[in-house]
Amino acid sequence: MTKSHVIFSASIALFLLLSISHFPGALSQSNKDCQSKSNYSCIDKNKALDLKLLSIFSILITSLIGVCLPFFARSIPAFQPEKSHFLIVKSFASGIILSTGFMHVLPDSFEMLSSPCLNDNPWHKFPFAGFVAMMSAVFTLMVDSITTSVFTKSGRKDLRADVASVETPDQEIGHVQVHGHVHSHTLPHNLHGENDKELGSYLQLLRYRILAIVLELGIVVQSIVIGLSVGDTNNTCTIKGLVAALCFHQMFEGMGLGGCILQAEYGWVKKAVMAFFFAVTTPFGVVLGMALSKTYKENSPESLITVGLLNASSAGLLIYMALVDLLAADFMGQKMQRSIKLQLKSYAAVLLGAGGMSVMAKWA
């Protein structure tokens, strides 16, 4: 399922870049530079190529370190899901993901879709970036909600079957209400606690697995777009700062994703597949940008619209996941609610992560 999502998102990005050649009202006739590459003073094609090759390996390595660190550091309290330190580290990573959506991806989308290279009608008449980001967040909520509902019904059926095998068929199972947490009511006799706890654990694990898959999907789309921008440009001044910022970004975003994958309790094969696709998507985007450098022009209307819309959809997904499924779920959880001190530490971690990534917006 994860592999197909990644291939699907990569295929969409490539398909749009290659096939979308004419949008209604895309080209502003007054701007003659829209079909050409940007003209900067520090353009050096040969040096840029060396920096791009270096960026592929450096981003790949830092991404692998970030996403795999939670898997192999279980002896460290900060990477043990049952420990309070894990919530603090996860809050830091969630702040990075939140800032990525608000400070990096969404502003780029607004800038691209309001470019003078696009005609006033319709691109300057309507805030497409905000609209697409909003619809992306709503769509993510819909997928999140419907998927959880489907699997919750399946879990209830399994629970009824377990109870029926022990109790009489006419005995009812207590109502289970799911909204971030599981609230138990009445179950017959000695099965009350055991079965309700089992269903609660099942639903919580389900939430973690949905979270891990949807979060990875959003990160993959965003990473391909970022990689495209690195692979396409020959501006050495831009690449240097961008690569350094991306290494920092990928490592800590990988830690956030790795923590979610760890909580999902996948087998080692699926963990390896998800970590691999996270690590290779940005380098893949760089290679794709290099391959399309002759046809992909960052200021062309086709590229501005395609990348702008992809950025907007990715931003909506990342913002939703960071606020709803990561931060809200943890801060409203029992462990956080029982400790004001832990909440304050976690808020500080969120601000530190979001603040650090906001500063990185100067270069990336």
Swiss-Prot record:
Localization annotation: Cell membrane
GO CC annotation: plasma membrane
Transmembrane regions listed in the UniProt entry: 53-73, 86-106, 126-146, 210-230, 242-262, 272-292, 304-324, 344-364
Membrane topology label: Multi-pass membrane protein
MF GO annotations: zinc ion transmembrane transporter activity
Domain of life: Eukaryota
Entry similarity comment: Belongs to the ZIP transporter (TC 2.A.5) family.
UniProt xrefs under PANTHER family: ZINC TRANSPORTER 10-RELATED (PTHR11040:SF48), ZINC/IRON TRANSPORTER (PTHR11040)
Stored NCBIfam families: zip
Protein name according to UniProt: Probable zinc transporter 10
Organism expressing this protein natively: Arabidopsis thaliana
Lineage, opening ranks: Eukaryota, Viridiplantae, Streptophyta, Embryophyta, Tracheophyta
